[in-house]
Amino acid sequence: MIDVMQIQKILPHRYPFLLVDKIVELKTKQIVKGYKNISISDHVFMGHFPDHPIYPGVLILEGMAQTGGVLAFESMDDKVDPSSKVVYFTGIDNAKFRNPVRPGDRLDYEMSVVKNRGNLWIFEGKAFVDGQLVAEAELKAMIVDK
């Protein structure tokens, strides 16, 4: 497992934009599973929507992307200092949102490698709440120098 303190050593994101709390499974160049606990105190619920809080789909995608970023960094053949690199997401295809995510939910991310060539990555991403699919997308990324 990779806790949030270790995640912050891999990814440049910080509160309020660090959207993965823990990595619970990681098989290099294959799959990563992580999650974010969704809380009513998350700043986004002040405006989305005050009387009907729904976690925004674009933040679900960003959480998936960050989870995939951990997998990409941890899968690099030549281990580099993550502080000198950054993962840029270059494309999102076939994004679908199946069910709303609400405060109190645990949002589980699952990112599988579809293709990897050098610093280029294609992931199949899925997000679940209580085992039910809430979102899915294909995400494309590349690792570049800062």
Curated annotation (Swiss-Prot):
Enzyme Commission numbers on file: 4.2.1.59
Lipid metabolism keyword on record: yes
The keyword Ligase is assigned to this record: no
GO CC entries: cytoplasm; membrane
Catalytic class of the enzyme: lyase
Compartments in which it is found: Cytoplasm
Keywords linked to the UniProt accession: Cytoplasm, Lipid A biosynthesis, Lipid biosynthesis, Lipid metabolism, Lyase
Primary location group: cytoplasm
Catalytic reaction annotation: a (3R)-hydroxyacyl-[ACP] = a (2E)-enoyl-[ACP] + H2O
InterPro entries cross-referenced by the UniProt entry: FabA_FabZ, FabZ, HotDog_dom_sf
SUPFAM superfamilies in the cross-refs: Thioesterase/thiol ester dehydrase-isomerase (SSF54637)
One GO MF term: (3R)-hydroxyacyl-[acyl-carrier-protein] dehydratase activity
Domain of life of the native organism: Bacteria
GO biological process, one term: lipid A biosynthetic process
Active site: H48
Recorded family membership: Belongs to the thioester dehydratase family. FabZ subfamily.
Role: Involved in unsaturated fatty acids biosynthesis. Catalyzes the dehydration of short chain beta-hydroxyacyl-ACPs and long chain saturated and unsaturated beta-hydroxyacyl-ACPs.
The name this protein goes by in its record: 3-hydroxyacyl-[acyl-carrier-protein] dehydratase FabZ
Source species taxonomy: Bacteria, Pseudomonadati, Campylobacterota, Epsilonproteobacteria, Campylobacterales
